[in-house]
């Protein structure tokens, strides 16, 4: 009996050991299987990672479509069930589920079924939490039935739980996978949408920029293919009285007429009477009766016969000498000889002016004749509504007076349907030196390319430096040069005075100047009532400051400068010109030194001295016009040696005796010239440095390019050869740079990973972008780089935005190297914005905001260029 008990116990021990061994083997197999599955999963992930981006995108799209279809089907089923379901149907479902479980466990399983049914959606939404299932419960019941003792082995229970975890991990709800796929798809779609949005914004920016560029682009005209009609240039028949003059008589007459100097071949002899010109009676009535001009002035005596003979001329004469009438009379005779304008044809006479005020002055002079002669003239300039100008041109204007910028806008508007220059045969450039000095050379060249080559071109100015003379000869064919009274000479009718202030503190010097100005104004107002005073200053801010001071001293006055709107400038000139306005003082920058002709202007005060002598001549030339007397007073300090030298030179050239010039001025002049000889200073005069070539680096690069192309010849030995095919003059052997070399850089918004090399220090960011803004219009650039715009973008995107590079004019090629302090270094690139950020997303957001600002700025620039026309015609 005892042996049987021991045998049974040994067998039970053996069976337990076998069971344990068997379970351990099962556990090892399970672990091996799990490791193998994990390796297979890693391989699948690696294979998926190596797939191309295109395959991923296609797979995403397919999955997205499948998910959408399945989602749509589920929503339909859910909607149907929500409508049709009832408590009876719910009970029948529960009964069917309950029937699959044994009867003794029905009460328990019903509860579990109900619990599982209620939490089904939650299990889908929260897959991390393990939920009990009916399958696991039935397995537990089977284990209990297999065990005869009804006991549950701990190891069996552990292995069963592991198998359940494995099965649950393999059986992840499909809804969770689909949700993950949907998230990936949504991320991909959002990236695609962002790329599409950036692409659309870039296309919009490009189109607006191109549209703004095209507004000022003129079509290239091949004049050799155009069928131009012939026209007459020569309207002058020399009277027999003049034909009988000998050469000595002609020279003496020219000497009497303020020393006229002429250069060129076959120069006509000067005239002394209006009748010598052979003008029609209608012209003579206006000249002698209405305008009361008794005889031609010096410039008119020589220029009128030369222009009426059909010659191109360069006329240089002092201010107020009647240059305007010298080109107006031949132009009217020229137009009257040609057929009337037809619909769609442009003007016959074209007059270009560097400033708006001068254009208005010329137009006013022309209207004295056009009203009686049945002609029409149109004045076009920027800063005023364009619709009225378009309306006048549409009606047909035989004479067009304007500034180069606005004329180009009108020519380019509506693809050239507003007006054209095919009928133009007479061209005038008034104040031509200032035209080139202000950087209008590209615009003038553009306009001249639209005009037939054999047209007659006339240039007039009060000064004509050698540099500008060479540029002007490109536009003329075999021109005559007529110089009256010398170049850059103040008229003898003007009394020149200088107020010298010794060097001191700036505030003290300013107080002394203002006190002296008040004394002069008080004395002048007593001696010359209702006379006008024009005060010149150097800067716009100085004009506004002086206005406040004079108003505080009970001196009514107005200001005019480039920073004011056109309507304000026009109002200021109108009030100043009126006798009864009560405003007898006008403060201005050098913008009023050209074309301002006000009757009763007896005093000009240079509160700040001009920076060169030519500007001085034009400033003081606003008084003493048409033979009247005038006074010019210039304020200068002893440390302004260059200005003092110019003043002494101007007075000397005006034939003022040296003993009448203050000795202190001559002393300062001599000291300065000694410094120039010693090489301490460089003394130059004339216009220059305010136009397109104002940057030293650009001047150096231009000079080096010219040396390579033209050779090291001196400017004085340059020979000009007329090119009859295009009406321009070229240097021997000159070759022009192709236009393609000067390209317009559109802004690029590419984000680059890594630190920008142009920044330094520990704060370098991980992503950066360079946005070129050099070639944007000035208004658009200001819109982007102004402090408010950049600060908002920096705050909202947490990026760093810095201005880099240097501004280059659109037609200027960036040099490779520049000379700084005698050393050559790489030239700075075109102006751009450097955007830096810690993340790629922040840089992209900043780029997007900058792009929006650019688009907004281009829209504003386009509106301002057209002045928002509201009339019948629009650009």
Curated annotation (Swiss-Prot):
Residues 10-20, 32-45, 53-88, 132-153 have a biased composition (Basic and acidic residues). The keyword Hydrolase applies. PROSITE patterns: DEAD_ATP_HELICASE, HELICASE_ATP_BIND_1, HELICASE_CTER, Q_MOTIF. One of its GO terms (molecular function) is ATP hydrolysis activity. CDD domains: DEADc_DDX46, SF2_C_DEAD. Residues 1-92, 108-177 are annotated as: Disordered. GO terms for cellular component: nucleus. It is found in: Nucleus. SMART domains: DEXDc, HELICc. The Q motif is unique to and characteristic of the DEAD box family of RNA helicases and controls ATP binding and hydrolysis. Belongs to the DEAD box helicase family. DDX46/PRP5 subfamily. This is Pre-mRNA-processing ATP-dependent RNA helicase PRP5. It comes from Scheffersomyces stipitis (strain ATCC 58785 / CBS 6054 / NBRC 10063 / NRRL Y-11545). The gene is PRP5.
């Amino acid at each position: 009996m005892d042996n049987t008990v021991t045998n049974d116990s040994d067998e039970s021990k053996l069976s337990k050991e076998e069971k344990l061994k068997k379970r351990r083997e099962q556990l090892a197999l399970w672990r091996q299987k799990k490791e193998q599955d994990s390796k297979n999963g890693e391989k699948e992930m690696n294979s998926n990672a190596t797939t191309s981006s295109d395959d991923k995108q296609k797979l995403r799209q397919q999955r997205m479509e499948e998910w959408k279809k399945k989602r749509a089907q589920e929503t339909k089923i859910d909607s149907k069930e929500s409508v049709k379901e009832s408590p009876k149907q719910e009970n029948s479902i529960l009964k069917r589920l309950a029937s699959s479980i044994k009867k003794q466990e029905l009460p328990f399983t019903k509860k579990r079924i109900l619990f599982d049914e209620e939490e089904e959606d939650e299990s889908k939404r929260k897959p991390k939490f393990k939920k009990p299932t009916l399958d696991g419960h039935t397995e537990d019941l089977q284990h209990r039935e297999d065990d005869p003792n009804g006991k549950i082995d701990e190891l069996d229970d552990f292995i069963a739980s592991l198998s359940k975890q494995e099965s649950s991990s393999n059986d992840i709800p499909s809804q969770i996978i689909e949700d993950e796929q949907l998230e990936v798809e949504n991320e991909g779609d959002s990236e695609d949408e962002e790329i599409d949005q950036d692409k659309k914004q870039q296309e919009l920016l490009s189109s607006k920029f191109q549209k703004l560029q095209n507004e000022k682009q003129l079509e290239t005209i091949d004049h050799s293919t155009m069928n131009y009609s012939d026209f007459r240039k020569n309207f002058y028949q020399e009277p027999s009285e003049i034909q009988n003059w000998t050469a000595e008589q002609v020279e003496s007459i020219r000497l009497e007429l303020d020393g006229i100097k002429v250069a060129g071949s076959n120069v006509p002899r000067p005239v002394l009477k209006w009748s010598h010109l052979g003008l029609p009676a209608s012209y003579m009535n206006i000249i002698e009766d209405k305008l009361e001009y008794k005889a031609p002035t010096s410039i008119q005596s020589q220029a009128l016969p030369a222009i009426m003979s059909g010659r191109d001329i360069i006329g240089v004469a002092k201010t107020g000498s009647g240059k305007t009438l010298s080109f107006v009379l031949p132009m009217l005779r020229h137009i009257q000889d040609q057929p009337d304008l037809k619909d769609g044809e442009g003007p016959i006479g074209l007059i270009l002016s560097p400033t708006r005020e001068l254009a208005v002055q010329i137009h006013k002079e022309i209207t004295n004749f056009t009203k009686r002669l049945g002609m029409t003239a149109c004045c076009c300039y920027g800063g005023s509504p364009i619709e009225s100008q378009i309306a006048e041109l549409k009606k047909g204007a035989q004479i067009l007076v304007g500034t180069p910028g606005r004329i180009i806008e009108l020519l380019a508007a509506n693809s050239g349907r507003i007006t054209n220059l095919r009928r133009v045969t007479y061209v005038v450039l008034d104040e031509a030196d200032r035209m080139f000095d202000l950087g209008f050379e590209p615009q003038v060249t553009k306009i001249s390319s639209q005009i037939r080559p054999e047209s007659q071109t006339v240039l007039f100015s009060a000064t004509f430096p050698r540099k500008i003379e060479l540029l002007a000869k490109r536009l003329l064919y075999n021109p005559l040069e007529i110089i009256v009274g010398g170049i850059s000479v103040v008229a003898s009718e003007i009394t020149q005075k200088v107020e010298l202030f010794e060097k001191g503190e700036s505030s003290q010097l300013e107080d002394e100047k203002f006190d002296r100005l008040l004394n002069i104004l008080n004395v002048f107002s007593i001696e010359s009532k209702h006379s006008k005073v024009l005060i010149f200053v150097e800067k716009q801010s100085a004009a506004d400051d002086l206005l406040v001071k004079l108003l505080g001293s009970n001196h009514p006055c107005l200001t005019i400068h480039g920073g004011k709107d056109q309507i304000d400038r026009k109002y200021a000139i109108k009030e100043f010109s009126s006798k009864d306005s009560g405003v007898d003082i006008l403060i201005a920058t050098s913008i009023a030194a050209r074309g301002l002709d006000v009757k009763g202007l007896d005093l000009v005060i240079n509160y700040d001295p001009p920076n060169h002598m030519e500007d001085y001549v034009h400033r003081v030339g606003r008084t003493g016009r048409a033979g009247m007397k005038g006074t010019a007073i210039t304020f200068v300090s002893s440390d302004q040696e260059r200005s003092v030298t110019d003043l002494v030179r101007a007075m000397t050239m005006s034939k003022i005796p040296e003993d009448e010039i203050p000795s202190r001025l001559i002393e300062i002049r001599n000291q300065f010239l000694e410094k120039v000889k010693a090489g301490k200073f460089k003394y130059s005069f004339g216009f220059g440095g305010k136009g397109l070539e104002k940057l030293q680096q650009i001047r150096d690069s231009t000079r080096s390019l010219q040396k390579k192309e033209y050779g090291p010849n001196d400017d004085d030995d340059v020979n000009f050869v007329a090119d009859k095919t295009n009406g321009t003059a070229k240097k021997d052997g000159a070759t022009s740079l192709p236009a393609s070399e000067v390209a317009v850089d559109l802004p690029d918004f590419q984000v680059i990973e890594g630190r920008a090399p142009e920044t330094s220090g520990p704060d370098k960011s991980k992503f950066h972008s360079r946005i070129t803004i050099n070639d944007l219009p000035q208004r658009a650039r200001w819109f982007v780089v102004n402090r408010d715009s950049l600060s908002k973008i920096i705050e909202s995107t947490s990026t760093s935005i810095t201005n880099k590079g240097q501004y280059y004019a659109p037609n200027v090629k960036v040099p490779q190297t520049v000379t700084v302090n005698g050393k050559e270094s790489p030239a700075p690139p075109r102006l751009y914005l450097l955007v830096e950020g810690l993340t790629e997303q922040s840089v992209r957001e900043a780029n997007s905001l900058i792009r929006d600002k650019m688009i907004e700025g281009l829209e504003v620039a386009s509106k301002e260029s057209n002045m928002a026309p509201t009339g019948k015609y629009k650009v």
